[in-house]
Amino acid sequence: GVEAEPENLTYYYLLAIGYAQFERHDDMLAIALRAVPHINERSDKRVAADIYSVLGDSYHQKQMNEEAYQAYEQSLKYNPDNIPVLNNYAYYLSLEQTDLDKAEEMSYRTIKAEPNNATYLDTYAWILFIKGNYAEARIYIDEAMKAEEGNQSDVVVEHCGDIYYMNGEHEKAIEYWQKALELGNESEVLKKKIKLKQYVQE
């Protein structure tokens, strides 16, 4: 393992994934940080990218966004086509409403790579929504809903309501918000949208 072969990045990555499954975020961050000094030009690029990806996710869990973004940049240096990193990085930028053109570009690459992935379609729709491209956002959120049929996530359904609202379909929007609530979304903002029957920004 790590103690016997400190240069072997795969051990660190597997440990980090194990910690992630048990939501042991501090351990996940610690093991990723231990791996970083062992990354060099001889390292397997994909594994190095995955280590930085874990580091980015760990920092984001701790709301250390700048550090998270730096880690994602490093990850993409080692593997520019790391689709989950492109998606997470883009989505987190959109939540902060920062660097939205970059977010849109990264997100677009993910839906080109996996056109039926509901998570990636949702991210792309959400970025378009934040940028005020409501009609286009609706096309992609409809795709996300279709891709998730029968197994919809409350976040995607809430986003769907927001996008429909901004497209002037208020009744439909309220239905989607109600559905998001039924799916277990406990957000106070969502409850406010339903009560006021209008879109409320996070």
PLM-predicted stretches and their roles:
Residues 6, 40, 46, 80, ...:
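Short coil turns that delineate tetratricopeptide repeat
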Residues 11, 45, 51, 85, ...:
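TPR alpha-solenoid repeat register
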Residues 22, 62, 96-97, 131, ...:
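Structural motif corresponding to the intra-repeat A-B loop/turn of tetratricopeptide repeats
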Residues 2-3, 37, 76-77, 108-112, ...:
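Conserved structural position within tetratricopeptide repeats
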Residues 14, 54, 88, 123, ...:
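Canonical tetratricopeptide repeat
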Residues 17, 57, 91-92, 126, ...:
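Residue-level recognition of tetratricopeptide repeat
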